[in-house]
C-alpha cells in the first residue's frame, strides 16, 4: 500500500509539469516581408526572462507576422489571433523598431505586476531633427519634457513597441464591426486609419481629415471609456492614462538606408 501511494505521488508530480501552457503573450509584427539585419539581430538576441520561452515550460510565447496588409489591417489580424487563442497580452513590434536587449525583461515586469494595461516603449520619428513619438494632447506637437529613465504618462502612444492587456483589446474586439481585409479575411475593426472627405453644407467647401491608426485608437479608448468599462477605473480618471517607459528606448531604422533615429 505504501509503495502504491508513493508511485501515485510520483505520477501526480509528473503530470503537474505537463499541464497546458499559459497563453501569456503574442508578439505581432506587421511587415511586407523584408526587414533589416539590425532589426533581426535585436529581435532574436533578446534576453529571455526565466520561464518565459517559445519552446518552454509554463508560459506560452507566440509570434505572428501578417504579410502585405496595411498597418491597421495587420493590427486587426494580430488582435484576432490574440482573441481566438486566448492570449493575456499583445505586444506590437513594428518591423522598423529596434528593441534594446533587455526589452523582454522590462515587459515581463509589467506583465507580472499587471497594474498598467497599456505600456509603450520610446522611439523617435525618422527625421532630422527627430522628435519623440510621445503625445499629450492633439495638434500641439510632441511632448519632450522628460529624461531617459523617466516613466511618462500620456494620452497618445505609437504602436511600434506597444504592450496591451487582454481586457482592453477583447472589449474593443467585441464591440467593433466586422470587415473584410486582404485575401478575403474577415476581422474586426479595432484599429482604423481615419480618412474621410465631406462637403460643408454652409460653404459648399469640400473638406478632408486623415490621421494615424495609433492615435485614433488612443482617442477611441478615451472617447468610449474603454478603461473604465474594462475595470481600470483609477486609470480611467487620469488625464493621461497611457504609460511610456523611456527605459524601453528603441531605435527607429530606415529600412532602405539603415539610418537609425534619433541620430545623436
Positions of predicted regions on the chain:
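Active-site nucleotide-sugar/metal-binding loop of Leloir-type enzymes
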Residues: 77-89
